[in-house]
Amino acid sequence: MARSERGGEKGVLQIAVCDDERAAADLIAGLARDWARGRGVEACVDTFASADALLFSLDDGVPDVALLDIEMPGASGMELARLLRERGERTQVVFVTDIIDHVFDGYDVDAVSYLLKPARADRLFLALDRARERLGRAEPVLVV
């Protein structure tokens, strides 16, 4: 995932889906693709079976939007979101999980939304709309 100045490869919105349940990851990725087609947004949707796999891929680029499960083997989705924030990344985080216990922790990592499984298209689309809006408002950062 090579990123441009505002995130995304040459204007392509990079969306990462991270869920250890293959069926859930495929459903969420499919909904994200449906959202992009419906909005006329060019997007690349990648799936990852663990937070560790997504962390490893950060060397290739940071996603614009991360759709994260929370409870996974190894690092949790919440730990991944905290790491992204510690690194200063502007990745827009949406939690899609069946664990309600961490809903308030989402505020600590400035999550766009916290959705319960099974993912509903209307709620995921609204969360992706919000994430895209936030990305559009992001101020460019100069690192020297």
Positions of the model-derived regions?
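Conserved sequence signature across two-component system core domains
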Residues: 18-19, 48, 66, 96
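Helix N-cap/capping motif at the beta->alpha junctions
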Residues: 47-53, 77
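Switch/coupling loops of ABC transporter nucleotide-binding domains
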Residues: 13, 43, 91
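Non-catalytic signal-transmission and effector/linker regions of two-component phosphorelay proteins
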Residues: 1-16, 29
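Two-component/phosphorelay signaling modules centered on CheY-like receiver
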Residues: 22-46, 86
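CheY-like receiver
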Residues: 56-139
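C-terminal output/effector regions of signal-responsive regulators
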Residues: 143-144
